[in-house]
């Protein structure tokens, strides 16, 4: 049986739709009354593991799931050995540096050396500031990173931005974009190499599906 790791939250609905177009019905995971974390398809051909977004590449890299759907931001942050198979085109956002609108900073290089930068994505942030040769102190936060500059704990943040509304509502502005992110279909490398054709069939079917307007 093929096991697919699906992230709870914002990517789930579009992930289910994409697999449905490829012939795998995981719609039961969308049932508000569902409490199962391992959900088989009605045909018994595959099963879905419902996991946190950040855990998808872990399940795939260890081979507990042969396929998974996860944001590129998570892949870049965790750097786990998974095969990136398809850019699915939904869940679009960007990783950005943001500061208080009143700070006067116009770009990342305006930030003072050794200033504090708050982020959930400290690996991505470190890689970016190292590329600028700008030493900063990174403060890891698990949520509401916007509070860093608001409270004065940090000069800036590095975080995902979709519409930018949360930043605006909290008096912050973007000054740099690190990279663009979207949902990716990933695979367990060894499983893909030893595939008898079943995984390739699914990947090919998913790749052939054009993103709907609702997904883009």
From Swiss-Prot:
InterPro entries: ATP_PRibTrfase_cat (IPR013820), ATP_PRibTrfase_CS (IPR018198), ATP_PRibTrfase_HisG (IPR001348), ATP_PRibTrfase_HisG_short (IPR024893)
Disulfide bonds: none
SUPFAM superfamilies xrefs: Periplasmic binding protein-like II
EC number(s) reported in the record: 2.4.2.17
Pathway recorded for this protein: Amino-acid biosynthesis; L-histidine biosynthesis; L-histidine from 5-phospho-alpha-D-ribose 1-diphosphate: step 1/9
Annotated compartments: Cytoplasm
GO molecular function: ATP binding; ATP phosphoribosyltransferase activity
Record bears the keyword Transmembrane: no
GO BP: L-histidine biosynthetic process
Example of a GO cellular component annotation carried by this entry: cytoplasm
Annotated Pfam families: HisG
This protein's record includes keyword ATP-binding: yes
Enzyme class name: transferase
UniProtKB keywords: Amino-acid biosynthesis, ATP-binding, Cytoplasm, Glycosyltransferase, Histidine biosynthesis, Nucleotide-binding, Transferase
Catalyzed reactions: 1-(5-phospho-beta-D-ribosyl)-ATP + diphosphate = 5-phospho-alpha-D-ribose 1-diphosphate + ATP
Domain remark text: Lacks the C-terminal regulatory region which is replaced by HisZ.
Role noted for this protein: Catalyzes the condensation of ATP and 5-phosphoribose 1-diphosphate to form N'-(5'-phosphoribosyl)-ATP (PR-ATP). Has a crucial role in the pathway because the rate of histidine biosynthesis seems to be controlled primarily by regulation of HisG enzymatic activity.
Summary of subunit composition and partner proteins: Heteromultimer composed of HisG and HisZ subunits.
Family of the protein in this entry: Belongs to the ATP phosphoribosyltransferase family. Short subfamily.
Name of the featured protein: ATP phosphoribosyltransferase
Gene that produces this protein: hisG
């Amino acid at each position: 049986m093929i096991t697919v790791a699906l992230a709870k939250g914002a990517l789930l609905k579009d992930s289910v739709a994409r697999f449905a177009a490829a012939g795998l019905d995981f719609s039961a995971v969308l049932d508000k009354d569902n409490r199962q974390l391992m959900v088989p398809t009605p045909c018994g051909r595959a099963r879905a593991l419902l996991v946190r977004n950040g855990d998808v590449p872990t399940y795939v890299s260890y081979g507990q799931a042969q396929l998974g759907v996860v944001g590129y931001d998570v892949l870049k942050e965790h750097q786990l050995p998974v095969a990136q198979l398809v850019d699915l085109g939904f869940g679009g956002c960007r990783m950005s540096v943001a500061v208080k609108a009143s700070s006067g900073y116009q770009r990342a290089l305006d930030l003072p050396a050794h200033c504090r930068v708050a982020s959930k994505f400290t690996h991505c942030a470190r890689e970016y500031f190292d590329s600028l040769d700008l030493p900063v102190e990174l403060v890891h936060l698990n949520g509401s990173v916007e509070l860093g500059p608001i409270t004065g704990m940090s000069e800036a943040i590095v975080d995902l931005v979709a519409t930018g509304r949360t930043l605006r509502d909290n008096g912050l502005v973007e000054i740099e974009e690190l990279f663009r992110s979207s949902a990716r279909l990933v695979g367990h490398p060894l499983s893909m190499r030893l595939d008898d054709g079943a995984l390739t069939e699914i990947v090919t079917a998913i790749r052939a599906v054009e993103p709907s307007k609702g997904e883009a």
